[in-house]
Curated annotation (Swiss-Prot):
It comes from the Eukaryota. PANTHER family: MYD88 (PTHR15079), MYELOID DIFFERENTIATION PRIMARY RESPONSE PROTEIN MYD88 (PTHR15079:SF3). Pfam families: Death (PF00531), TIR_2 (PF13676). This is Myeloid differentiation primary response protein MyD88-B. The lineage of its organism: Eukaryota, Metazoa, Chordata, Craniata, Vertebrata. InterPro entries: DEATH-like_dom_sf (IPR011029), Death_dom (IPR000488), MyD88_Death (IPR034249), Myelin_different_resp_MyD88 (IPR017281), TIR_dom (IPR000157), Toll_tir_struct_dom_sf (IPR035897). Adapter protein involved in the Toll-like receptor and IL-1 receptor signaling pathway in the innate immune response. Activates expression of target genes in the Spemann organizer region during early embryonic development. Is required for normal axis formation. Residues 106-143 are annotated as: Intermediate domain. One of its GO terms (molecular function) is TIR domain binding. Keywords: Cytoplasm, Immunity, Inflammatory response, Innate immunity. CDD domains: Death_MyD88. The gene is myd88-b. Residues 27-105 form the Death domain.
Amino acid sequence: MACGSSMNSFDMNSIPLVALNYTVRHRLCLYLNPNAVVAADWTRLAEEMGYDYLEIRNFDRYPDSTMKLLEDWQKKCFRATVGGLLEMLKKMERNDILTDLAPLIEADCKKYLEKKHGPLPLQDDNVDSSEQYRITKSDDPYGSMPETFDAFICCCAQDILFVQEMISRLEQTDYKLKLCVFDRDVLPGTCLWSITSELIENRCRKMVVIISDDYLDSSECDFQTKFALSLGPGAREKRLIPVKYKPMKRPFPSILRFITLCDNTNPYTKVWFWDKLAKALAR
């Protein structure tokens, strides 16, 4: 990768950011935390990562803004790799960081690859079963890079035909979105509630709630919706996207009335339905 360093023996874009240990992160913070006049600091890095002004201001309230930024980017961005970080530092013209940290980064990447290609570690008896390495079909078996999704699909079994249409419209087209469909993607043998919570809170950027009369009778859908709403008033409006795809006989759920509905039953707006939904999931 063209990062101006000597780390040519690795494909840095294939190594997740989690490979970088505390020493590298701490030294990176020492470089980027101070407000420098001539050198780009952590706020410029946040801009390169795609954060907006209000999000960057929020990071500013933490004692170690750079460390918090790295943790958040690693958690939210599906493409948070060592290579991506190095490319941004190069774009910021922070060659001093690249030169100083290159040996440490290379060492961490070697350790990560050695661990990845070694034997699977045994699960600690003190670790709860909900924290096992694999909970979805495509999870990294070593736990280094959990599988992430654009959206968790909250639905009941009676609406599965519409979910299948969503898959064909959103995953198998130019939108190339990645949906988390519980019955398709989650491995059996895990605790239903804890795995669902993990997926909604940490693995999926959004949650599509498919509203129907059958949805109102589903205890699983009720739990998923209320859990997503409990994650915080600042995030829940952006996280939840209610979808109505067929007429209902029963009242619309009151807890979702304050969130804009994506309605596929309105004949006047039906033509824009899939494009609007795809853009809402991608933003």
